[in-house]
C-alpha cells in the first residue's frame, strides 16, 4: 500500500472514492487492531496515509516529526514517509475551517460548545480558537479535564451555547438514530456542525435545520481534508482546486432521491426511469409493504387503519 487510510473500522468510509477522484493514484482502506498499529508504522511500507478513529493520537509516539500545528492540536490525521522518516500533519483543521467558511458559520465572538473529547475534538478546539471564539467548552459523558463539562451541565447552561460542534460518533452509520445533544434545547444557537458524513445528514443536523439553525454534516470537511492530504502526499497545491467539484460529485452519488405523491401519480414509472438513468437501485416502499404483509395496502387500511399503516411504513422506509 502506497497511499491509504488506517483505522479500526472503515466499512463506512468514503475516503477511497474521494482520493481516487482527486487523482490517478490507488488509495486503500486498511483496518488495524490496536495491537497491530505499532508494527504497521515501524515497517514504513507506505508513502502517505490518513489516520482515523481511534488512532489520531496513538500514532504520535511512532513519528519522527510532527508538524507544529499538529503538535499544538495534539492529533495527527496524515502521515508521510519522507526518506524513511515519518512526518505527521493535521489536515482536519483545514477541512473543518473550510466547511465553516463554506457554510458561512462564523465562530468569532461566539460561545462554542464541542461535543466529545476525542482526537477530532482537539481539532475543533483549535479551529474555534483560531476563529476567535469568545468561549470554548468541551462536553463529555465523563468530564475530567480543564474546560470540560457534563451533558447535564450543558443543558443547565441552555442559554449559553451559540455554536455546537459534534465530534462524537453518535448518529454515525450503522447506528444512525439519536444525537449527542438536542439543538432545540438551546435558544441562542446560531450554527451547528457535525463531523459525521455517513449519513449525509444526521438527526443532529436535521433537527437544527428544522428549527432554522444553519447546520452542516461533515462531507465537505472530509473532501477538503482529503485534498489537503493529497497536496502533502504529492507536494502539489492544485489538488485544493478540485474540492468543490469532488464534493458535488460525491454528494450526487450518495444522496437518495425520494419520490412522494398521491397514488397512481406516476412515482413508480418515474422512479424506474431515474434508476436506469443514474444507475441507482430502485426501491418501492408500497411493494415492500405489500410483500411483507402479504396483502394489498387498501386491505390493510380497512382492517388496521391509517395509524398502523404509517407506523409500518416508517419501519420499512428506515430499512430502505
Briefly describe each language-model feature range:
Residues 287-320:
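ATP-dependent small-molecule kinase phosphotransfer cores
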Residues 195-255:
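Adenosine-phosphate binding glycine-rich loop
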Residues 131-148, 283-293:
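NAD(P)-binding Rossmann-fold cofactor-contacting core
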Residues 268:
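Walker A/P-loop
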Residues 2-103, 199-201, 207, 211-214, ...:
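Phosphate/diphosphate ligand-binding glycine-rich loop within oxidoreductases
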Residues 147-216:
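Rossmann-like adenosine-cofactor binding region
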Residues 7, 90-93, 100, 109-129, ...:
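Glycine-rich adenosine-cofactor-binding loop
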Amino acid at each position: 500500500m502506497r497511499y491509504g487510510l488506517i483505522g479500526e473500522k472503515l466499512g463506512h468510509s468514503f475516503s477511497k472514492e474521494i482520493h481516487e477522484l482527486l487523482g490517478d493514484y490507488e488509495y486503500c482502506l486498511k483496518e488495524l487492531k490496536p495491537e497491530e498499529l505499532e508494527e504497521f508504522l515501524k515497517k514504513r511500507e507506505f508513502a502517505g496515509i490518513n489516520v482515523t478513529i481511534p488512532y489520531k493520537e496513538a500514532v504520535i509516539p511512532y513519528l519522527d516529526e510532527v508538524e507544529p500545528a499538529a503538535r499544538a492540536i495534539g492529533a495527527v490525521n496524515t502521515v508521510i514517509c519522507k526518506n524513511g522518516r515519518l512526518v505527521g500533519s493535521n489536515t482536519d483543521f483545514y477541512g473543518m475551517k473550510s466547511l465553516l467558511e463554506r457554510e458561512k458559520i462564523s465562530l468569532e465572538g461566539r460561545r462554542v460548545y464541542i461535543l466529545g473529547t476525542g482526537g477530532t475534538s482537539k481539532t475543533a478546539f483549535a479551529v474555534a480558537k483560531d476563529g476567535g471564539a469568545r468561549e470554548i467548552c468541551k462536553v463529555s459523558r465523563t468530564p475530567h479535564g480543564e474546560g470540560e463539562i457534563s451533558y447535564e451541565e450543558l443543558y443547565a447552561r441552555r442559554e449559553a451555547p451559540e455554536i455546537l460542534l459534534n465530534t462524537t460518533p453518535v448518529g454515525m452509520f450503522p447506528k444512525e438514530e439519536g444525537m449527542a445533544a438536542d439543538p432545540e434545547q438551546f435558544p441562542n444557537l446560531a450554527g451547528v456542525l457535525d463531523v459525521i458524513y455517513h449519513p449525509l445528514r444526521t438527526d443532529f443536523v436535521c433537527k437544527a435545520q428544522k428549527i432554522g439553525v444553519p447546520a452542516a454534516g461533515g462531507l465537505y470537511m472530509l473532501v477538503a481534508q482529503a485534498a489537503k492530504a493529497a497536496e502533502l502526499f504529492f507536494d502539489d497545491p492544485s489538488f485544493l482546486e478540485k474540492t468543490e467539484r469532488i464534493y458535488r460529485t460525491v454528494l450526487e452519488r450518495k444522496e437518495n432521491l425520494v419520490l412522494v405523491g398521491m397514488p397512481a401519480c406516476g412515482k413508480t414509472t418515474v422512479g424506474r426511469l431515474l434508476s436506469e438513468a443514474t444507475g441507482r437501485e430502485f426501491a418501492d416502499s408500497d411493494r415492500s409493504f405489500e410483500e411483507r404483509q402479504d396483502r394489498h395496502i387498501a386491505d390493510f387500511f380497512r382492517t388496521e387503519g391509517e395509524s398502523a399503516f404509517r407506523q409500518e411504513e416508517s419501519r420499512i422506509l428506515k430499512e430502505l
